[in-house]
Amino acid sequence: MAERTYIAIDLKSFYASSECAELGFDALRTHLVVADQSRTDKTICLAVSPSLKEYGLPGRARLFEIKAKLKEVNATRRKAAPGGVLIGESYKADELEANPNLAAGVYIAKPRMSHYLAVSAKIYGIYLQYVAAQDIHVYSIDEVFMDVTGYLRAYGKGAHNLAKEIIQRIFDETTITATAGIGTNMYLAKVAMDIVAKHIPADADGVRIAQLDEMSYRRLLWNHRPLTDFWRVGRGYARKLEAQGLMTMGDIARCSLGKASEYYNEDLLYKLFGVNAELLIDHAWGWEPCTIADIKAYKPAGHSMSSGQVLTGAVGFETARLIAKEMADTLSLDLVAKGVKAGRMGLMVGYDTASLDQKRLGECGTPELKMIAERAAAEYDGPIAVDRYGRRVPKPANGSIDLGECSSSSARIRDAVDELFCTIADRRLLVRRLNVVAAELVAEEELAARRTVPDYTQPDLFDIVEGDVEAQDVAARGARPEPEMTERHVQRTILDIKRKFGNNAVIKGMDLFDDATGQQRNNQIGGHAA
């Protein structure tokens, strides 16, 4: 098979850069975070600008971490400042460098997801001027893969020059900086961008582009640490590998060559990760057989849709139950909008750390919640998990319920989720996260086609009598539409109104309760302000 050439492009600190472009700031020299501070300081920042990351902050820090870091920075600046005092504040790196008496500040921009989607669409339009849609895979709002194999000869330039031209065009039209990786497969392009390009100096035009093939990947990155820098290696994978003494991609590659009689062999990897070990071994060697054409042609065996939210604070059983019903109601409308029905509903209930840690009771708000948390901390004897911050928390509750037959009925789905919530949720605990899943999705057209297939079930006498009585009853009162069919017409009407007048143009009575979150979520995209 002929060698292919892929380009991966990542828009640097996309959300923060989009805000800086709108405000006329230099995205690389402005202390800016995108976060909704009305959600308290524990809210996760959607983006952190590059100049703030230079202080050692991660890209998805919480707002209180940003403020704590700036407090440290300003303590250091105060010691070094003439007179030992800081007068005034600035969020611009150039001003801070020029005036040591200024305190480092931060500009907090409220998320505007609609704006970011529009900017992303504009940049996608730039990609389309160079590469056809069938050769582009949109990986996320700020990242794409492009198969440029068939374009290099036509443009008369190499992949590096083509990537640079596209990146320069993006900057000229949006002032957003991008980084690129070039590889002989999508994995190498991604790793070149994520690891190599982000750690090399920019060229004269401020552009960072790195290129890898299988041999240069092994030479440059087989000893790279940490493993979590590599695509698809999360903290869980890294912990399992490091527990076995496998610290690098080179270690994994060598392990895959081991003999059956040796401890380190590919069987060890399959024992740790099952079938996913095959992908891990391929990536350790720099192999990736999947192409963009394969992605476009992929048809999953099963489909599902989900809706999840992390609540701004801990809530009790009844409030969480209300929110779960709201989410189920919204998800049912999403099913109707997509023209699909669900055969099964799933639910995950995540608990708050205050349910076990009495030191955190002060964060629970109302006296009622504090009483629940205090009782839970004393009485709870169920399974315990440890979150990413090392805190003990009750293990999340999970469950699913069969709908009997596929449905998109709001009433049916809402009742099923309510029944499931009451079955799996622990009334003693405080809830912080909820996730509702509609599974076993089937298109309405497919269901209609199934109904046209003759049913060859052998009837018995009672079936015939019952059917005859029902037929006479229908004839007596006149044909009426099924209740679910009537509800679907109502749902489609609601969707039409929402599209025209906004998501809060039609709301349910339960959305008016003080603790309901439906109206707030209707003004969000992906959990952030639209």
Roles of regions detected by a PLM:
Residues 78, 153, 196-197, 306, ...:
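Alpha-helix boundary/capping detector
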Residues 39, 153, 187, 310, ...:
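Generic "edge-of-domain/loop-turn" microfeature
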Residues 18, 378-379, 384-530:
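Acidic, metal-coordinating catalytic segment for phosphate/diphosphate chemistry
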Residues 1-292, 461, 466-530:
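Gly/Gly-Pro- and Ser/Thr-rich, intrinsically disordered tail segments characteristic of DNA damage-repair
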Residues 182-187, 282-285, 341-353, 430-443, ...:
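A glycine-rich phosphate-binding loop feature that marks nucleotide/adenosyl-phosphate handling sites
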Residues 8, 229, 237-431, 451, ...:
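DNA-contacting surface of Y-family translesion DNA polymerases
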